[in-house]
Structure formats: structure tokens, C-alpha cells
Amino acid sequence: MLCRFASLVGALGCVIVAAVGPAPAADIKATPLFARIKASLDAVPAIDTHEHLRPFGEMPNLDATDRGPAMTLHSIFAGSYYGGINRLSRWPQGASFDQWWAAASGDFDNARATSSYRYLLPAFRDLYGVDFDTITAEQARELNDRIVANYQDDKWLIDVVTRRANIELMLVDPYWSRLQFARAYQFSVPVLNVTEIMRGSHREKLADVDSPYVWGEARDMKISTLDDYLAVVEKIFAAAVAADAVCLKSTQAYQRTLRYENVPRQRAAEVFGKSPAEITPAEQQDFEDFMFWHVTSMSAKFELPFQIHTGHGRLQGSSPMMLLDLIQANPQTKFILFHGGFPWVGETAAIAMRHRNVWIDSVWLPTLSYTMAKRAYQEWLEIMPSDRIMWGADTVQAEGIYAATEVTRQCLAEALAEKVDRGELREADALRIGRQILRDNALALFPKLKRQLWRKDEATKNAAGAN
């Protein structure tokens, strides 16, 4: 009898344990702690360190509609990272929205969990009041009509960037015209993209719009030798500084390996001037290696920190670890490793830990993988000082900018709230760190930004802090 009673008690215990099971992990986003941190970060007028926002009259991804070229719902996805990872039906030439939606409405089913899809949802939710996960054909048509109407002039774009996304300044990389430094908006700050400069072993290598040869000839500077070429490049740097450009940007990781050898000047001079038909791939790489080291030294000379695309793209040659020799040999140059080196976020942190002239920019990371971005923020803060981490949205229109900004603020707030909840950080320090990443670190790294601030209360506050 006693044995049967013990068995019964044991069985009941198993039932109770099975019924209760392990408690599900609490979602920090449902807590007052997260709400306080998120509200604090939302109030920070952000400095966005990387955008590709064109002048309004040159907006990309417009579709042919019965009302003429227009920004459409398709345009929003086509101008985002969604289309590079997931299926997106093309907009048929001259088609109506209904024709496109009939083909495209099923495109999103296999992407529902991807960050490249989910990061856009806050834009539809907050700017248009639409739950895109459950959108109907009628709602999609209405959403499309509202998007088309919003882009009849630039008022919507400016309002979303400055008020809804709460961005005060953004650094604009004009990859469509790398040697122009015009400011299309009050909030835009020019960047000198040096990607094509480093390829210019011969004038036929470059499009006219990006050519130091064409730029020099317009200023009576002829290029016959490597010395001539470098003299024009130095003038371009000086022009960028005069136009208030605050940094350099390289996207060579899309084209080639990030391993740059310290090639002697003489070897580059021997290669210079060879036509594309004559030069070998090895010789072209030697020239680019020399130029990358030269541009790195110019970065220090002109006090233009160097943003370098690392990670996602041409993965077989884009690990930030390949830059270590260059970084170590150039301690006066301030390097900014873009995208956190995704997927090598840990390696990127190790580089920054060992080299105080390295900053990490989380630009793009939350839209590639929200979970990895949250983990990266927490790991980076454990490995390196909080004053060398930044962020950027890296998009091309209002909805993408808002979405990337909102998801970054949320991801950062979640990462910080979890650390506070675990007792690893005081809430007051979490708020300060959040502001550093969203704003203060960029102002410290790019000091010229302080005189470009246009919100009077923040400009006054920063001026007072500088005195």
C-alpha cells in the first residue's frame, strides 16, 4: 500500500511538472524598464552616420504608372534590403498596382521571419497605420495610393526624417556621383567616397562622373604620371574638406579582397597608365593596394576618418580581420568598420579592443539580423568602451530611413534593458550609452558636425559642452 501511495505521489509530481514545464522567457520589451529606455532613446536627435539619400528630384526606384513615374509600395521594397535577399516581383512596365499586387502578394510568405522584411513593418505601422503582416488587397491599394501622393513633393520626406525619425544630421555617401559634395537637405552632410579613386590606374577604368582625370582637367590639372594622379587626389581631398565633408568611405569589399599589401610606390608607378587591355589582374591589385595605403595616410593628414565596408557582400574576402596589418601600421588614422563586420561581429570587437583608432558602426546590422545586432551591442559593450560605437540607417527613401532608425532604437533599447535587468548595468548608464551610440559618439569623432547642428536647443547644448 505504501509503495502504491509513493508511486501515486511520484506520478502526480510528474504531471504537475509536465503541466507547468519551464517558464517561458519574459520579453523585456513588455516591461516598464524597456519602455523607459526606449522613450529616452526616441527623444535623442540622432546622428545617422550613413545614408544614400539623393536630391528629391533624383529619387531612385520610381515605377511607371498611369500618373507617370511614381514612388510606389513596390518602390519601398525595391529600395530596401528586402529585394536583395527575398523574392520580389518586378513592376511590369506600364502595369497597374493591382496587376503587380496579384503577382507580388505571395512574395512575402517565406520572408515573414527575416529581419530584412520585419524592419520595414514599423514604417507601415507608424507612418500609415497599416499592419503589413495581415494586409488585404484593398488595404494594399490604399497604402500604395498614399505613398504615391506623399512623394509629389519633398515635404513628406523631410518631415519623416526630421520629425518622425528624429534625425538631426545624416552623412550621405553619394555613390552615384562620388566627387560632388553638394548638400541636398538641411540635415545632409557630405562624405568623400574614395572607392573609384583607388581603381584609377588608367582613365578608361573610371566613369567620367567619378574620374580624378576628368575632375583634374576641369581645373587645368593634367595627369600623365602617378605623381600627377596623386596631386589631383590631394586636391580632391582638399575640396572635400572645404565643402565640409567629414569622412571617407570605401566599398571596395564588394569588388575585391580587403587584404591590402603595402606595395612600394615604384611598383605602382610602373603599373600606372597601362590600359585595361594591358594591365594584369595582379598588377591592378598592386595599384589598388598602394592606393588604399596612400588614401589611409591621407585620411590622417586631412583628419577625415575612414569608413570601410566590411562583411556582408563579397564574403570570401571581406572579413575585417584582413585589415589588421593596415590598421596596426596606421595608428594616426581613425578607422570605422561598417556593418559591425557582419557576420564577424566578434572579430570586429576584438580588433576594436586592441586598437584604439578603430570604431564600430552598426549600420545595416539590425536590418540583416535583429538578433545578431542585439547580441553584438551587448558583446561590444563588454569588450570595448562605449564611446566607439555608432549607427546608421543606410537606405534611400523616407520609409526605409524611418524603419531602419526605429528598429535600431528598439534593438539598442532591448540590448541595454536586458543588461540592466540582469544587474550588469545601471539604468542611468544605459541611457547615457544609448545617447552616445545614437548621437554623441558621432559628434565626438566628426567635430565639424557640431557647427552644422540646426536644432537650436541641441546646438546650444553641444556648444556649451565644447567650452
Question: Where are the model-predicted features located?
Answer:
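Sec/Tat signal peptide C-region and signal peptidase I cleavage site
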Residues: 21-25
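Alpha-helical scaffold segments that flank or form the walls of functional sites
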Residues: 42, 63-185, 226-244
